[in-house]
Amino acid sequence: MIFHRLHQIIILLIYLSLSATSYGYTFEHKIENYGLTFATHTVDQDHRTSLILNSGKGISFPAEGFIMNFDIKLRQELYTYGYILRVISHNDQNLDLVSYLYDSKISIISGSSHEKSQMVYLADSMLIKKDQWMPIQIQFFPNSAKIKINGKNIYLSHSFRDFNDVQIIFGASNLGRFFSGDVAPMSIRNLSLQSLQGKTFYYWKLDRSSKTTNNFVYDSISDLPAYVKNGKWEIDKHYHWQRVTSFEIDYKNPQLAFDEIKGNFFVASDKKLYTYNVNNKTLDTLSFKGAPFLGVSSQMLFHPLKKTLLSYNIYHNKLNWFNPTTSSWSVNQKITVDDNQHHNRFFDKDHDKLYLYGGYGRHQYSGALYEYNLKDNFKWSQMNLDTLISPRYLSALGKYSDNKLLVLGGYGSHSGKQEDFPQNFYDLYLLNLNTGTCKKLWEMNHTDEHFVMGNSAIVDTLTNSIYALTYRNDCYNTAIYLSQFLIKTNRPIRQIVSDSILYKFRDIYSYCDLFYHPNDTSLYAVILEPSKNESSLCRIYKLAFPPLIPTKTSNIT
């Protein structure tokens, strides 16, 4: 927590080893996020996806047969039945693959217009899983076919009289008698057509950076076109924020926390706890007894060791714990604090310590660093950093290494007084928690566009980068971008690496934060804004990590 339409995409294949820290959790992983995503039953038939090789014209293969390879990723939706592909010979004989993820099943159907179809299927929940790439290979021989699905072989006969006129269609089909609007919820990539000896005739990587003109994508060997209708590209998820959900909160100043292990976002009002799970896409609500500490910025976090929520207040040494069994807080009364608004916080799970920095209240910007030791001290200790770093709020905080934090930007004044020339800060500091010292790493030149930060930053030490949500703080109707800054550099700049999210900035009454979820290697932006009748609106957005650099941006709502 204390953490480009593209004209051209630079990256053909993302094989990035990442080393970043979020909530004190260090992760290293590889990402291969590309492919063509098919729109299915969630849209009307006119907007479902097709991939038609050679624009629907027949392809000729050797008389002895050919091999088709591709990777597929099935996704869970309300309706999971649909065609993966149809292979059609002489507009008469066919071999189809049909998926039904609900039963972990893929069916293979072979038939023609003048005889009864033959059908076999693979139903295996250990092999056919949602949201996982798996290889499929189909070997066509003169009278039979061998289908290998994620390593499992299936055999059946077919009635193709030859391979001189073969049409191949993925997803929706409008080809005569082979019309179908049922599309499997899927993504595909690495599509190749080969000889039985392994010589590749055609290859479509399907990463959007391949040779593409209008709705056609061309294979990398012979420039054979494939027509894409209503397609979406997996790689777009690295620069377009996807709206995950939104819901109303029955309180004007809700509290926010995230459990990165289970993927739960917790939002608390003064009476209820809202829990949204990003894996299952479910929202649960429960009423509780007592209340968390309340204020205009979040003062709640998820304790990963105790696996529950805690609420904190710098004026109370006793922490406020949530008991999920009794649905109650350990503090029965409602306590509201107006100081220390929009402070940064970081929980060091390795040492079981909570750190707070900065904030605003009573016309004063804070330069204090607070520490709470949950192991033995059980009280707040304070260190003033005013002489080392100008007091501020609306900054971003992220863990750099053990006992070292990065403080990025913000708004405040050199003296801490609101009336004493308040200004935006475009700087980066390294804060040593052991020594209480602060080192200024750089300061950007003043920009014409004022901007501040979301509460948390994601630090990627391998690429020498720090990521934060940024937005203008000199207007009400503004927009949030994900921005990248180099940590060690002599020429610091802000690089926008996403499109935008509309944001209504009402100073301390609006709040946005950035989280990393290791299970789906994605960033999540959570926005809390005032709504009608003293309530709030929570919006959650998702971006695949690492982000890509766009040449154009567009607003989304």
Task: For the regions a language model picked out, list residue spans one by one.
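Short, conserved, GDST-rich strand-edge loop motifs in beta-rich repeat architectures
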Residues: R177-S180, Y357-G361, V407-N424, A468-A479, ...
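Short, aromatic/His-centered strand-loop micro-motif at the edge of beta-sheets
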Residues: S112-P135
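Flexible glycan-contacting loops in extracellular carbohydrate-active proteins
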Residues: L156-S187
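Conserved blade-ending motifs and adjacent loop-strand segments that build the rim/top face
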Residues: I389, W442-N455, K488-P518, S554-I556
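Beta-propeller blade signature
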Residues: G367-F378, D420-G436, T478-R491, S536-S554
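Localized edge beta-strand/strand-to-loop motifs within extracellular or lumenal beta-rich domains
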Residues: Q132-K146
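Glycan-recognition/cleft segments
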Residues: Y83-S112
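Extracytoplasmic low-complexity segments
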Residues: S22-I52, G198-R243
